[in-house]
Amino acid sequence: MTRPPPPLILPPPFRALAVVGEVWPAALDAARAGSEPGTVLWNDDLRRCQAAVILRPDCPLATCAASALRLTALAVADALSAVGPPNVPVAIAPPDRIEIDEGLVGGVRIAAPPGTEADAVPAWLLVGIDLAWLAADPEAPGRDPWRTALREEGFGDVAAADLIESFCRYLRHRINEWEEAGDAPVEAAWRQHTTSGAAGGRLSAARRARGADAAPPVDPAACLAGPSWAGLLE
């Protein structure tokens, strides 16, 4: 008999809704059905850590999509650093990938109502995270130096509930900071997190050769079309 997932302890305005199976399709259905902003859909899966948050923006899609994607990625990086092993090298590979020790561990994604114009305020905005607990090939972990998994990087004692709770706390902090202080602190944190993984990583020389310090801008249209990491966690 499958045990129900533990209840999440989330800061307001978030409230949890556990789902079975893939979170993103369920979250899209919930957003389209008019679920309240702040609803956090998540699963307690053994292979992937997935969550999605329904937001209600008050600015045009072109602005809020790029900001939401960056705030979500920053919150994931913050959460992984908080609940993981000390000094774990977490970094963001723009626009939407999350790396540990320069290996892809997952990413973030966004969605809005189809057909929303760039200068229109969307009825809802959905942000999601998808992280690999286990390697794509559990029989040969570490075979692919460009991909990794949380269990391989020392997160074996971390529960999905703990990681998602931490992510939600940091997401609220990042959103509040952005609403109060604008883009400046987001830009500073983005530069820090998109380069911090370069020092001491297993592929740091190659990363520096590619020019890691020059983080490209986030293209909201491209990100709304789908995540760049789609299919790479399988």
Where are these regions (language model features)?
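Conserved, helical-rich catalytic subdomain that frames metal- and/or nucleotide-binding sites
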Residues: 156-208
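Short histidine-centered catalytic/ligand-binding loop motif
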Residues: 53-67, 145-160
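Acidic (Asp/Glu) carboxylate-rich active-site/surface patches
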Residues: 85-118, 130
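Short polybasic amphipathic segments
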Residues: 98, 203-216
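Short, acidic (Asp/Glu-rich) active-site segment that either coordinates a divalent metal cofactor
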Residues: 117-153
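Short amphipathic alpha-helical signal-transduction/dimerization elements
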Residues: 77-81, 151, 168-175
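N-terminal lobe of the biotin/lipoate ligase/transferase fold
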Residues: 1-86, 104-105, 111-113, 210, ...
